[in-house]
Amino acid sequence: MKKNNFIIMMASYVATIGVALAAEYFVSPTGNDEADGSVGRPWRTIQRAASAAIAGDVVTIRAGIYREWVKPANAGRADAPIVYRAEPGEKVVITGSDPITEWSRRSDGLWEKNIPYDTFGGLNPFTDFIQGAWFSPKGRNHFRTRLIQNGEPLELHGEDIYGKMTNGIPKIATGHAALIPGVVSGTIYAAFKSDPNVVVPELVVRPACFYALKTRRDYIVLRNIVFRNAGPQWGHPRGEQAGIVGSNWSRGWIIEDCEVSGSSCAGITLGKCANDFDAFWTDRKQSFGLWGKRLFERDLSEVGHHIVRRCRISDCGQAGICGAYGAAFSLVEDCEISYCHWKKPFEGAEMAGIKFHAPVDSIIRRNRIHHNGSLGGIWIDWMGQGTCIQDNVLWANQGHDIYLEVNHGPILFEGNDMLSKNSVWFRSNNVAIIGNRIYGNFTCDRDEDNGSRKTPTLYPHSMKIKELFVSTLPGNFIFINNLMPNKPYFGKSIEYPCRFEDNWYVPRDYWKIDDVKGTVAVNPPAGSKKPVFKRVDKERLGKTVLLDQEFPECSGSIAGEL
């Protein structure tokens, strides 16, 4: 016993010493990577600090623009994360773009610039294109780069411009540019709106701003940093999911008070790493049986547990936040996510403001999600088991505000405003819809081949597979205390009975939506009968079909409180 007590005492002592020895490193645009990183002798690059920082250390970054891809070398611990933060009160920008200077003016009015390939930082703007499983290019190549002048990207052309060239020179309109590859260099021909030698444009030359090359770089905090302009590859759920910022199969990241924008594909990724058995940027029809079995043989409980809060995420080609399996047990709150996949230059199956696979026991709450593209606001795909979507405002999305694809639940929608033309698309079962204001249309249908698609179920509150192939036929939707234009009709799509209790149906003519501010006012017609709303608890919701699992804890919302 005395020996055990001594071991415990020494372990506590060592842990205390480790925290006490934690360092604070400083980075400044005027620093020097040969310095010691102290407050008086800061480093020049964030990467220099990221190579040195270990558990418990803090990296304080002074105001400026940092043109680098930061690759964290080490992991923190749950009780001693590695913190990367802007100096309080100062603006720090990490960008994947570089200024392009010394343009030549041609006699035809175009601007020309030849750039050697060996000047780029991990992304070749002339030859690297978006590609991958579940990606539809719409008949043309799409560059991972961007050419930006005065904050506005130009429309880029590659092979599609070859038929419009005279003597090797493209014909392009103002606001467009052509990227013509060579052997060791490439040439840009651009029709800028302003003189590029006065208003200097920037070209995206890096695939990320802060992304770990190695997995399990756990417990990292990013605080009050602006990340913009990078060219990650398409992030599909059976391969590596890279973003402007990405955890790469790690645990316990906190990304707070940050801005993320200008991604070719994803903004923030909390998802999968690359494996030799992945469908990595290849055809989508790889057998799920082998892939799924090998994926879930890993200890998936080691990843996830992330927090993304108070962030502004915008202008991402694919998704604002995405995460396949690595976003389990995570929290996304108080964020604004907008204009992701808004211009829709390509299509695919991974586009939304938030796109998660297997967000087990994850919470998405108090976010403002608007003006997003084809699949809309929030897309939960597979194993949304114990997922809570609470107190969000979704509006002006081109697709549905919320899309549930082949989940078995339980999933809780509570206290949300869903104000787009199309509010909800159900291809799942076991969903509790409590105390929401739902303006748009409902869609409920069976997945491909009349709902024959089967997906895994998990043991409650874990990432351990219970059954690999379980029916996803829709049903057991529980509507209580909602304000809606009408009672949804699901027809023959439903396999399991649904419940409608104490909902208030007010026709759309009496709703006023502000698509700029994301607000709603509802003025029911005279004589409209408001039901007596009653509090909702887990006992009232009951358990799920198929899984016999309780729904997540509900705050008991009623529509009259929204």
Regions found by a protein language model. Give the residues of each.
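Positively charged n-region of N-terminal signal peptides that target proteins for export
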Residues: M1-N5
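Short amphipathic alpha-helical "recognition" segments used for binding
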Residues: F6-I7, T519
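Bacterial N-terminal signal peptides
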Residues: M9-G18
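Boundary at the C-terminal end of the N-terminal hydrophobic targeting segment
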Residues: A20-A23
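Extracellular polysaccharide-degrading/modifying enzymes targeting complex plant/algal/animal polysaccharides
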Residues: F26-W249, E259-G262, T269-R298, G527-L562
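Glycine- and acidic/polar-rich repeat regions and solenoidal domains
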Residues: F210, P232-N248, S264-T544, D548-E550
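Mature catalytic domains of secreted/periplasmic carbohydrate-active enzymes
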Residues: W253-I254
